[in-house]
Amino acid sequence: MIPAASFAGKQVSLFGLGGSGIATARALIEGGAQVLAWDDNPDSVAKAAATGIATADLRGADWAKFSAFVLSPGVPLTHPKPHWTVELAKGAGVEVIGDIELFCRERILQAPTAPFIAITGTNGKSTTTALTAHILKSAGRDTQMGGNIGRAVMTLDPPKPDRHFVVECSSYQIDLAPSINPTAGILLNLTPDHLDRHGTMQHYASIKERLVAGSETAIIGIDDSWCAQIAERLERAGQQVIRISKRLPLTDGYFADGTNLMEAVHGRYSKVAFLEGIGSLRGQHNAQNALAAVAACLKVGLDLGEIQSGLESFPGLAHRMEQVGRKDHVLFVNDSKATNADAAAPALSSFPRIYWIAGGLPKEGGIEPLRGFFPRIAKAYLIGEAAPAFSATLGEAVPYEISGTLAAAVAHAAHDAAKDDSGEVVVLLSPACASFDQFKNFEVRGEAFRQAASAIDGVKPIGGAR
């Protein structure tokens, strides 16, 4: 845990008592702050109180006594309208911050030279975070990984000069971190997302920009116009900017040439790493993730040999194009995290012949945006509530069956794929749907796929992230 010593002897209010909220409250208390916490969920309040955290409805609190208000990133700060606690805090002139801001202040207080790599973007954040941390760890560096990837940042070990921090940041977290100041800030990409919470694409992009604007070195993917404009703006302001591209040769920066990762310096090219044969980093989208990780690791002092070794040993993330098993020429891939069409596109673009398991609780737009990948699909196996709509979209373009359940889909897809003599084929779960019609969440759905695949006679499991 990182004790939040920057608020020692001060009173702090806190709202949001999920897992990260309780962890943040404990860090404040350990640092010597007096914390008063609340949540709209009575069960969460009771759980926090049972751990010794002082709780009270903040509507009746004396806000003039608080030095800061710590807000859970899941609670609306501005849109669709500010949460009632935010209005109370602002009315009393109390600053509103989140756990990432607490971490940034503690790093400056305890070890301002501790390498800090912060990652954001609409897609690819978690893979880039995990990959960067893995490369650092495999090179023997003291490395802590947390943030939006699943471990509350204040539960990490405290900052010290040689300890590396790799932190995934959502737009909600950045919005609550006004002094975020990473050694290397990574902005991968920007597409419309979370606009219910941010109002407009412009506001969403401006929040993401803060992470790289506050960084010592800004590493920015320039394959979309929003990020390209941010890179130009920061460079004009005198900031060090490293551009990356997964599809375009650059004059300066890092780009992908097939499976080779290239560095460009004033138009002169050299290969810095390669992804050939690394199953966990297959696909153009993973080239972008790897480029960002390579640039960040070079920034904090790793050499190319250390980086290549880390790339080759990266196990990948569970439920994200995760290779879970193989039987002869048939590969089984769990991409359960693909809960909409955009998220399914990378996997569909990464394999030439696919037995595709899709469906679940449908999202707006369906699978029409994936039509360009239909020629790669040997057959589709449709499950869940989306099956009728998906079958209508596939029409005569792709052979399909309505399997109904995931277990039936895996069994039928494996049977058909085994008879395919066209070379390597893949049984791919990339649902393009939420899971809630048949499963608790995408993780449970992915585990069900793994179990169904491993139950097939002759399938050999592939080690990876579990």
Swiss-Prot record:
Q: Which residues bind ATP?
A: 121-127
Q: Which reaction does this chain catalyze?
A: UDP-N-acetyl-alpha-D-muramoyl-L-alanine + D-glutamate + ATP = UDP-N-acetyl-alpha-D-muramoyl-L-alanyl-D-glutamate + ADP + phosphate + H(+)
Q: What is its EC number?
A: 6.3.2.9
Where is this protein found?
Cytoplasm
Signal sequence coordinates = none
> Looking at the keywords, is Metal-binding present?
no
GO molecular function per UniProt: ATP binding; tetrahydrofolylpolyglutamate synthase activity; UDP-N-acetylmuramoylalanine-D-glutamate ligase activity
Q: Which Pfam families match?
A: Mur_ligase_C, Mur_ligase_M
Q: Which pathway does UniProt place it in? A: Cell wall biogenesis; peptidoglycan biosynthesis
> What processes in GO biological process is this protein linked to?
cell division; cell wall organization; peptidoglycan biosynthetic process; regulation of cell shape
Record keywords, A-Z: ATP-binding, Cell cycle, Cell division, Cell shape, Cell wall biogenesis/degradation, Cytoplasm, Ligase, Nucleotide-binding, Peptidoglycan synthesis
Q: Could you say which protein family the record assigns here?
A: Belongs to the MurCDEF family.
Name of the protein this chain belongs to: UDP-N-acetylmuramoylalanine--D-glutamate ligase
Q: Which organism is it from?
A: Mesorhizobium japonicum (strain LMG 29417 / CECT 9101 / MAFF 303099) (Mesorhizobium loti (strain MAFF 303099))
